[in-house]
A protein has these predicted regions:
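Short, small/hydrophobic-residue-rich motifs at membrane-helix boundaries and re-entrant hairpins
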Residues: 1-123, 153-158
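Hydrophobic alpha-helical transmembrane segments and immediately flanking/interface helices
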Residues: 131-157
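Hydrophobic, aromatic-rich membrane-embedded alpha-helical segments
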Residues: 117-135
């Protein structure tokens, strides 16, 4: 039985930053053709909100809603697939960490999905659920507690 090295807040924050860059890039690339065809011109947010050009405001609103929906869907796929298949996202892999069940077993797609849903609970109170990792004795965020997971140094098991 190896010693488990649970990963704390800052390393996890760097991993999620890497994942965020990858996800944001995927969303931007997937919506680039649409963005190119919309006529934002030199649109400023103030103009959109005040109705100076209502067509541009409608296009901007449509684009922002679509951007959020695509981001949500890609986030679901990204985190559920990577965590469910290998226990690690590219960000976690880069920093040599992975997600496991509290029993030490690898997580599956169901647990990965529950963990992803737990992200929303962690975000509800101004992201307190994520910062919880820094103060919890087991270094678990709320999403980890909901899914019954730990983030550990890769290669280490319970």
């Amino acid at each position: 039985m190896d010693i488990v090295v649970k990963i704390g807040f800052w390393k996890r924050a760097v991993a999620i930053f890497i994942d965020f860059i990858l996800l944001k890039s995927a969303v931007n690339i997937s919506l680039f053709p649409l963005k190119r065809n919309l006529d934002f011109g030199q649109l400023r947010l103030f103009d959109a909100l005040t109705g100076v050009n209502s067509q541009q405001a409608k296009e901007l609103t449509f684009y922002l809603i679509l951007y959020c929906l695509v981001g949500l869907i890609l986030s679901l796929i990204y985190f559920t697939y990577f965590h469910g298949s290998t226990g690690q996202t590219p960000g976690k892999s880069f920093l040599r960490m992975k997600v496991i069940q509290v029993s030490g077993d690898p997580i599956n797609y169901k647990i990965a999905f529950i963990r992803w849903l737990g992200y929303f609970v962690s975000e509800i109170a101004m992201c307190l659920g994520f910062f919880w990792v820094a103060f919890d004795k087991n270094k678990q965020g709320w999403h980890d507690k909901i899914a019954g997971t730990y983030v550990v140094k890769k290669g280490r098991t319970l």
